[in-house]
């Protein structure tokens, strides 16, 4: 038994195939999906989705969105996504360091749009780095 998995971003279909297991970064924590899972709709956080297909684990960096599980069909609709194997690890690490420096620089400041954007950029950069591993 397997799952039918589709990961869709506004500009591309990131994954469309079968999987034995999916681990999603929901806003309340990680959710594991196996064949026969109960129906579910959940919000997704910025993070890494893990997919076990053909016995091998693959990572996909997700930039927030929603997931729906119905029977053995899993549909993931996200604001953006990248396959871990297509991310340049060196570039991703450098972007993470820049984002971390920006967040540190804003520490102690009052909440602002700029501070929120800096934190979101940090979360995205961290997800991209984690997806390369």
Swiss-Prot record:
Main location class: membrane
SUPFAM superfamilies: Epsilon subunit of F1F0-ATP synthase N-terminal domain
Cell location: Cellular thylakoid membrane
Pfam families: ATP-synt_DE, ATP-synt_DE_N
InterPro entries in the record: ATP_synth_F1_dsu/esu, ATP_synth_F1_dsu/esu_N, ATP_synth_F1_esu_C, ATPsynth_dsu/esu_N
Region called Disordered, residue ranges: 103-133
Keyword Repeat included in the entry's annotation: no
Annotated family: Belongs to the ATPase epsilon chain family.
Summary of subunit composition and partner proteins: F-type ATPases have 2 components, CF(1) - the catalytic core - and CF(0) - the membrane proton channel. CF(1) has five subunits: alpha(3), beta(3), gamma(1), delta(1), epsilon(1). CF(0) has three main subunits: a, b and c.
Its job: Produces ATP from ADP in the presence of a proton gradient across the membrane.
Protein name, per record: ATP synthase epsilon chain
Name of the encoding gene: atpC
